[in-house]
C-alpha cells in the first residue's frame, strides 16, 4: 500500500515535463499530492539564445505527464511555463490556484546552462542564465510564499547543482546563478521558519537527463573530440566514484522526503546527491 502522506496537498513543479522535474512530479503524485507541472516546450524554443543549453520537450510531453500524474488518482494540471516571464509565471500560478485552491509545495526544477569563457561571454547569455536559474525561482517563490505563510504550511525545494559549490571552466554564469540560489534558499527558509514553511536546495551531480546529454554534446564540440555522446558519457561515468549517472528518480526521492511532515526540521540546507563526486 502506498504512503499517501501528501493527500490533500497541492504541488507546483517547474520544469515538470522532463528530467528531474517530471520524476519529482510523479513521486509527489504517488504520495497523494495534486500536481501542477509547468514547462518550456518545443513551440517556445525561440526564447533560447545561441550557446544556451536548454532542453525543451515536445509539446505533447505536457499532456503525457498530466496523464501519468492523474493515473495516481490525484488532480493534475500541465501547462506551458516560461520562468523568465512574469506574465507566464503569474498566469500559471492563477491557473493552479483556480484548479486546486492553493499551492502547498513548490519545486523549482526548471534550469538551463551555457558554456562560455568569461572573456567572451555574451552579456545577453549571462543575464539569461541568471534569469532562468535564479530569478525564475525568485518569481515562483514570490507567488507562492504569501499563501504558504497565511495557511501556515509550505515546502519549497530548489534544484541547484554541485556547480553551486565549485568553479568550473566555461560555466561561470551557471555556477554564479546556482550559488545565488543557495543564498535565496537560506533567506526564504529563515523568513518561513516561524510559519511552518521550509525551504531547501538539492545539489545533484551528473544525472541521466536529456538536458545533461545535450550538455555532453556541447562539451564534445568545444573539445573538438571525435567521439559519440555515448562514449563521452561512458568516460564521464568512469571518472565518477560510483561509475554511473544518477537516475532522476533518485533526486525525486530526496525531494519527496523533504516534503514530509517529519522533515520540517530540515530547512535552509543544501543537500548534495552526487555519488561522492564534487562535480
Please state what every model-predicted region is.
Residues 141, 177, 185:
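Active-site helix of classical SDR
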Residues 1-100, 114, 124-125, 217-218:
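Short-chain dehydrogenase/reductase
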Amino acid at each position: 500500500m502506498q504512503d499517501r502522506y501528501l493527500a490533500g496537498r497541492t504541488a507546483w513543479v517547474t520544469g515538470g515535463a522532463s528530467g528531474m522535474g517530471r520524476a519529482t512530479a510523479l513521486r509527489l503524485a504517488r504520495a497523494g499530492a495534486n500536481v501542477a507541472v509547468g514547462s518550456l516546450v518545443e513551440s517556445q524554443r525561440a526564447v533560447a539564445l545561441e550557446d544556451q543549453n536548454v532542453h525543451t520537450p515536445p509539446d505533447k510531453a505536457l499532456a503525457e505527464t498530466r496523464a501519468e500524474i492523474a493515473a495516481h488518482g490525484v488532480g493534475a494540471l500541465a501547462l506551458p511555463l516560461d520562468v523568465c516571464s512574469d506574465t507566464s509565471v503569474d498566469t500559471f500560478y492563477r491557473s493552479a490556484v483556480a484548479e486546486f485552491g492553493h499551492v502547498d509545495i513548490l519545486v523549482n526544477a526548471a534550469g538551463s546552462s551555457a558554456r562560455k569563457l568569461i572573456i567572451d561571454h555574451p552579456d545577453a547569455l549571462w543575464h539569461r542564465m541568471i534569469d532562468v536559474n535564479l530569478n525564475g525561482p525568485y518569481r515562483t517563490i514570490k507567488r507562492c510564499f504569501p499563501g504558504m505563510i497565511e495557511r501556515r504550511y509550505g515546502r519549497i525545494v530548489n534544484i541547484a547543482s554541485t556547480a553551486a559549490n565549485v568553479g568550473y571552466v566555461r560555466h561561470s554564469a551557471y555556477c554564479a546563478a546556482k550559488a545565488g540560489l543557495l543564498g535565496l534558499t537560506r533567506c526564504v527558509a529563515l523568513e518561513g521558519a516561524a510559519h511552518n514553511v521550509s525551504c531547501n536546495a538539492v545539489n545533484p551531480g551528473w544525472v541521466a537527463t536529456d538536458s545533461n546529454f545535450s550538455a555532453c554534446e556541447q562539451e564534445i564540440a568545444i573539445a573538438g573530440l571525435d567521439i559519440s555522446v555515448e562514449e563521452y558519457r561512458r568516460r564521464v561515468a568512469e571518472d565518477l566514484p560510483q561509475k554511473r549517472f544518477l537516475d532522476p528518480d533518485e533526486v525525486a526521492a530526496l525531494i519527496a522526503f523533504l516534503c514530509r511532515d517529519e522533515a520540517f526540521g530540515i530547512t535552509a540546507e543544501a543537500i548534495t546527491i552526487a555519488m561522492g563526486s564534487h562535480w
